């Protein structure tokens, strides 16, 4: 879509309940970072913000590539996702600091892939 090969309406996928629209990444070109930094991407984000209550962009880890830094500048806020039992606290702190250093508002964090057997005593009857 950012390369001019498709229209937004052609890329949208709607869930079975009609409550969630998704734009899959599709083919990721070698120049994907240039596309994410392009005026076309900025215009796409602005268009999506005008059409939807929430726009969520799922990106690679901030430590791995610069995608989150480039795209995060278009976001009102970021949610930092931490893989349970995998991501050391110093790495989490560096990642959050890196986002904040470039002016990205980190609204919070989510811990993913939690092994509920390890925390069976927590939460009671939830």
Where are the model-predicted features located?
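P-loop NTP-binding module
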Residues: 1-126
